[in-house]
Amino acid sequence: MSDSFDPTPDDRFTFGLWTVGNPGADPFGPRVRPSISPTEIVAGLAKVGAYGVNLHDNDLVPFGASAAERDRIVADFKQACEDHGLAVPMATTNLFSHPVFRDGAFTSSN
């Protein structure tokens, strides 16, 4: 029996864009790694046998992007997922890092 495990898409492992593309910044210091584009992340995940990729809206499209930028980014990401056979089993909204949400936004009494 081998001690190594070689995952395949059948194992259904998924990874978040925010984990793979994390630049290494924290409250104690600035980023320490270069940015990785979402399409590069998709290619890398496919290479290691991942099933899919998860994301928050702003992991893919930065806050403040124009409609044209958004459409290009989404089209490129969708094409990369199709080209590499990755699913997107979870996409959600970031309701925690933008300052507008500092008081809970939707539940804030202010």
Labelled PLM ranges:
Residues 1-110:
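N-terminal pre-domain/capping segments
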